[in-house]
Amino acid sequence: MIDAEGEDEAAPCHWLRDRLLQWGRRPALVWHDEEISYAALCDAVSRMLDTLRRDRVPPGSTLAIFGDYSPGVCALLLAAIFHRLTVVPIASAPRAGQQEMLATAEVMFAAYPDADGGCRIKILDERMPRHALLCSLGERGAPGLVLFSSGSTGRSKASLLDMDDLLAKFREERPGQRTLVFLMIDHIGGINTLFHVLAHGGTIVTARDRTPDAVCEAMAAHRVELLPATPTFLNMLLISDAVNRYDLNALRIITYGTEPMPASTLAALRTVLPAVRLKQTYGLTEVGILPTRSQSSDSLWLRLGERGYEHRIVDGVLWLRSRSAMLGYLNAPSPFDAEGWFNTQDLVQVDGDYVRILGRTSEVINVGGEKVYPAEVEDLLLQMDNVEDVTVSGRPNPVTGAVVAARFTLTRPEDATSLRRRTREFCQGRLERFKVPVVVEIAEDAQHSARFKKRRAAGAGA
């Protein structure tokens, strides 16, 4: 039995607690190839609640949880919600930036779940949260969640969300699926995946690490039906040929989002996994994950759902309004206008009820007044021989304002002169002249972040 704060329907996420209890012996989690039932998970949640009370962690305080999708982390996250805490998951943040994150979120306690079901809790600050948004959650007795942006385009922003509002969309019962959790637990996509699975009685499957072989090995061994991933990782999956080394017959759906999907990558996935449905997702920490419907498995056009969400297009840019939007940033002004609309900064094409994501406004390259979308150029360059990955960005130029630069990760060693020549020849007749990379470089390190998103500089002269 999960003895949460308040046993009536006013308790936070009471419906989720009741649902977890009803799943009983169903497998909730696969961790290190061991299945853990919902009953065992509920017992772990109860122990974590006892730990929070023993260590005098009061409702309304802020708790940082260090770790990924271990049973202890999942149990503590649930316990924190039921105990009316504001949670700050930390899994992918570099150590150098963690102190600033803890200070920004006014974290009082840091928790370190261990492999044996225990948890060490460290006091960081005995003062209750002072930020007005954090105080508002405490006054309402609502659990909260703080998620930090990657900071790829500047200072990392801290979004504060109301967990009751965020999880409300999962109350409608649906069939559960065996799902590999790939997106990090400190990312909105990871949180969305985790609670989508638990709320519907599905099974969370973890891989030993986030490499193509480890992911495919886990999917084959545990009959995974759903894989949410990023286009960057799916391209790595194709390059590695891991999909052909494992039995993935149970796989039914791959969802992808967080960055534009190259059409060439989508087509290649369709070829190697013809029985798998490919679905594009869309969401942002600030507004949550929208319900979407892809036009087809081989299409980059998608329809944005309207249940709890509204959207409009202003000057080619997507704006959203959401019932589950964040309360605000803890370290930046509110990005919402007076009517609650949020500018996503994503440029889109529109075709009837469908939209196609072109890329961020900050990443567009302005070459002598002509717009270049990095994703379009990358899609073509990925089709070149000996190319594992490529990132396109803008570089300042005194004549045109900017030129296109391409940074390649190669499959086999090749000298830069040869690569520059091949790039020009390959683009001839396939790209307009102003879109052809003028700067061609070879990357020595990975071009993606710990969250498997492309590291991309803002487009010069955008």
Name each region found by the language model.
Residues 37-39, 136-137, 141-171:
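Conserved AMP-binding A3 loop
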Residues 226-228, 242-298:
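Gly/Ser/Thr-rich phosphate-binding loop
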Residues 431, 443-462:
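Flexible lysine-rich "adenylation lid" loop at the C-terminal edge of ANL adenylation domains
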Residues 312-339, 370-372:
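Conserved ATP/PPi-binding loop(s) of AMP-dependent carboxylate-activating enzymes
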Residues 167-178, 186-226:
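Conserved AMP-binding/adenylation subdomain of ANL enzymes
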Residues 227, 283, 322, 345-435, ...:
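AMP-binding/adenylate-forming catalytic core of the ANL superfamily
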Residues 7-8, 12, 17, 25-56, ...:
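Conserved AMP-binding/adenylate-forming core of the ANL superfamily
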